[in-house]
């Protein structure tokens, strides 16, 4: 199974507002950069979108290490999602899970891979995270500001 490091980030100008997501996929000496943007979104949605797009870009099952500066993503996929699914996508307080569409998409995207989820401190000089941040900001720039 191919081993891949994925660095992801989301950005938002206003929350909600124009948002962007970015992902850097590193496979040995090879790299692939992905980014995109959406109007009227949130930082959490863009963080999720970055991981979903990165995993969906993989053409076959892989051993993946996902590096994210989003505790929302890291804890959500590693800890909270099991309870949400058991409760029919409701929180412990029985409220609907926010961003359920993206959580379900991420759950499906991760299913065919072996994934280790790593949280990294954002804006702390971590090269992969800084590159993902720059890609997310490029994603914001693709969205018209009208």
UniProtKB/Swiss-Prot annotation:
Protein's UniProt name: Ribonuclease H
Binding site for Mg(2+) 1: 9, 47, 69
GO BP, sorted A to Z: DNA replication, removal of RNA primer
PROSITE patterns listed in its UniProt record: RNASE_H_1 (PS50879)
Keyword Hydrolase applies: yes
Protein purpose: Endonuclease that specifically degrades the RNA of RNA-DNA hybrids.
Keywords noted in UniProt: Cytoplasm, Endonuclease, Hydrolase, Magnesium, Metal-binding, Nuclease
Coiled-coil annotated residue ranges, if any: none
Record localization: Cytoplasm
Domain of life from the UniProt record: Bacteria
Gene expressing this chain: rnhA
GO MF term list: magnesium ion binding; nucleic acid binding; RNA-DNA hybrid ribonuclease activity
Source organism (scientific name): Herminiimonas arsenicoxydans
Swiss-Prot/TrEMBL cofactor(s): Mg(2+)
Record keyword Glycoprotein present: no
Enzymatic reactions: Endonucleolytic cleavage to 5'-phosphomonoester
Enzyme Commission identifier(s): 3.1.26.4
Main location as per UniProt: cytoplasm
Binding site for Mg(2+) 2: 9, 133
